[in-house]
């Protein structure tokens, strides 16, 4: 199993501050670090809910601990358009600038990709989690899974979460 250690910039039932997200997440990672069947990943939610400062810390930790970074990225056209308007850059470009586009990255969704972004994923060793049912429910487009695969990107199947997937059924994802 892979347990994602959530990181987000606002309070939830799990943590009240950015530092608490990191502290609690790293405590979970330490608890399971020698378990052969349980891995951990840093799981910043998405570019629009995590600051550059947090992403910089995430990059350092992922490198130091040699653990993946699980990130919802290019989930919808709206996310990409909002980011371009607010920051002047596509979310993927922001992640490149922050040093997160590398072989630690598991990019979830990736429905809005350019050819150059696909090539960059392949070159960097990024993995993509394709969440077909969630993307259908959100009407957000599809990950170009076959183009990614042909480019040499590792493409996996994902479900996303309960808010955007009615059953979290991996076999259903395979049929979609």
Language model features: what each stretch is:
Residues 42, 72, 107, 121, ...:
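Divalent metal-coordination and catalytic microenvironments
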Residues 49-50, 136-138:
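Acidic-and-aromatic substrate-binding clefts and catalytic sites of carbohydrate-active enzymes
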Residues 5-10, 75, 132-136, 161-163:
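Short, acidic/turn-prone active-site loops that include or flank metal/cofactor-
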Residues 97-104, 146-176:
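His/Asp/Glu-enriched, well-ordered alpha-helical/loop segment
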Residues 1-111:
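Metal-coordinating catalytic core of metallo-dependent amide/deamination hydrolases
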Residues 104-114, 131-137:
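Catalytic beta/alpha-barrel core
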Residues 77-89, 117-122, 139-148, 165-176:
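Histidine/acidic-residue-rich catalytic or RNA/ligand-binding cores of hydrolases
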Residues 59-68, 100-103, 120-129, 150-155:
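Glycine-enriched alpha-helix->loop->beta-strand junction motifs that scaffold or abut catalytic
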């Amino acid at each position: 199993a892979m347990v994602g250690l959530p990181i987000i910039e606002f309070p939830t039932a799990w943590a009240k501050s950015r530092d608490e997200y990191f502290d609690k997440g790293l405590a979970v990672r330490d608890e399971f670090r020698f378990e052969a069947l349980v891995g951990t990943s840093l799981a910043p939610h998405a570019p629009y809910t995590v600051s550059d400062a947090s992403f910089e810390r995430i990059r350092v930790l992922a490198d130091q601990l040699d653990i993946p970074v699980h990130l919802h990225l290019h989930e919808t056209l709206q996310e990409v358009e909002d980011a371009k308007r607010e920051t002047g850059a596509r979310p993927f470009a922001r992640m490149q600038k922050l040093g997160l586009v590398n072989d630690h990255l598991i990019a979830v969704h990736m429905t809005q990709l350019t050819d150059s972004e696909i090539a960059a994923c392949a070159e960097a060793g990024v993995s993509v989690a394709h969440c077909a049912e969630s993307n259908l429910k959100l009407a957000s487009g599809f990950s170009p899974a076959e183009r990614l695969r042909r480019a040499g990107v590792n493409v996996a199947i994902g479900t996303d979460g309960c808010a955007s997937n009615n059953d979290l059924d991996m076999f259903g994802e395979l049929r979609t």
